[in-house]
């Protein structure tokens, strides 16, 4: 089903025309909603600390999570105290939930579980981003909030908007959901503060972002605490797959082919490359269908969901976002201006 949808969105399949009436309805509803905020019929809430929203305007993966991880590291290095709020897509909870490293994706969502495991950052998930932000401020000492995947959540006033684009697929056929991949029209690109192009060539008004592989990590080495300061499991040993080895691969993300292409670019020979649905809750049985004893490589997001039943020959490819220094400089300048406007000083150092 997922591959057929991608044919409609990105390969010009004629079935898109059958969905066009629904896209027109989607356009009408979303336009009225934006107009309600613009005219003051609905109110956006302003928070006492700067808010950075990271999102996209297409359905599926574009590189938001690596971007959030990059921002966390950047802000901590510069002396800020960041916290994260997220929708917690796919998780089962009521209200708002304080995320602790080691919580499962079923509890808090795929991306929050991965971010918490990697960084140990203060984080709250909730369907209502404003309530999540208030809980974050009440429970943690943070002075800047990163909103993961909140570009269309207009009830939350933001100081900086960062749009992440898949550089290869970009906006597909240019149509709104469900006939196309767009949550909002391509015009939205012109209203944000920063546009990051993940992969391929960036346009003149975009910052080029690449995802740099940093090595393979044993899935079985993931444990119930933050991995932020623990790199002992990254050491290469004789069992670690190396370029030229024949491996199997799996991915349950928005764009599995990007992951498979990355593995091949690293020199791995893919015997099997299996696509799972995005946000799939894996069981040991699911993996058994593709596991023939060869090294099995997966994404970090999938690894967090498979850690409870991981085998010794399962590995995930760790990646870090790489962005030009000009982006970091301009982002920090924007945050300092926002903090000054809100609090009469910079970031409280």
UniProtKB/Swiss-Prot annotation:
Its EC number is 2.7.1.130. GO terms for cellular component: plasma membrane. Coiled coil: none annotated. It is an enzyme of class 2 (transferase). SUPFAM superfamilies: P-loop containing nucleoside triphosphate hydrolases (SSF52540). GO terms for molecular function: ATP binding; tetraacyldisaccharide 4'-kinase activity. Transmembrane segments: none annotated. It comes from the Bacteria. GO terms for biological process: lipid A biosynthetic process; lipopolysaccharide core region biosynthetic process. The keyword Hydrolase does not apply. Pathway: Glycolipid biosynthesis; lipid IV(A) biosynthesis; lipid IV(A) from (3R)-3-hydroxytetradecanoyl-[acyl-carrier-protein] and UDP-N-acetyl-alpha-D-glucosamine: step 6/6. ATP binds at residues 58-65. It catalyses: a lipid A disaccharide + ATP = a lipid IVA + ADP + H(+). The keyword Transport does not apply. It holds the Pfam family LpxK. Transfers the gamma-phosphate of ATP to the 4'-position of a tetraacyldisaccharide 1-phosphate intermediate (termed DS-1-P) to form tetraacyldisaccharide 1,4'-bis-phosphate (lipid IVA). Belongs to the LpxK family. This is Tetraacyldisaccharide 4'-kinase. The gene is lpxK.
């Amino acid at each position: 089903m997922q591959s057929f949808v991608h044919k409609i969105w990105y390969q010009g399949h004629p079935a898109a025309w059958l969905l066009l009436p629904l896209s027109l309805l989607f356009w009408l509803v979303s336009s009225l909603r934006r107009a309600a905020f613009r005219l003051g019929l609905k109110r956006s809430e302003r928070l006492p600390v700067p808010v950075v929203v990271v999102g996209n305007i297409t359905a599926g993966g574009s590189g938001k999570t690596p971007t959030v991880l990059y921002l966390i590291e950047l802000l901590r290095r510069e002396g800020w105290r960041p916290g994260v709020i997220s929708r917690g897509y796919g998780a089962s909870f009521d209200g708002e939930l304080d995320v602790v490293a080691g919580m499962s994706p079923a509890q808090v969502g795929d991306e929050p579980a991965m971010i918490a495991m990697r960084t140990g950052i203060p984080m709250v998930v909730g369907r209502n981003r404003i309530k999540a932000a208030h809980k974050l401020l009440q429970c943690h000492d943070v002075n800047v909030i990163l909103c993961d995947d909140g570009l269309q959540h207009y009830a939350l006033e933001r100081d900086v908007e960062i749009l992440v684009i898949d550089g290869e697929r970009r906006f597909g056929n240019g149509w709104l959901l469900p006939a196309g991949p767009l949550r909002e029209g391509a015009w939205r690109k012109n209203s944000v503060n920063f546009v990051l192009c993940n992969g391929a060539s960036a346009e003149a008004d975009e910052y080029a972002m690449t995802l740099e592989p940093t090595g393979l990590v044993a899935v079985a080495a993931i444990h119930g605490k933050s991995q932020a300061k623990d790199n002992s499991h990254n050491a290469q040993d004789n069992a670690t797959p190396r370029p030229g080895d024949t491996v199997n691969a799996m991915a349950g993300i928005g764009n599995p082919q990007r992951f498979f292409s990355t593995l091949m670019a690293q020199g791995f020979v893919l015997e099997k490359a299996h696509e799972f649905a995005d946000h799939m809750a894996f069981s040991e049985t699911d993996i058994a269908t593709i596991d023939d004893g060869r090294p099995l490589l997966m994404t970090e997001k999938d690894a967090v969901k498979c850690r409870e039943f991981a085998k010794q020959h399962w590995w995930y490819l760790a990646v870090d976002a790489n962005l030009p220094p000009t982006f970091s400089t301009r982002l920090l300048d924007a945050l300092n201006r926002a903090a000054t406007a809100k609090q009469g000083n910079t970031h409280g150092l």
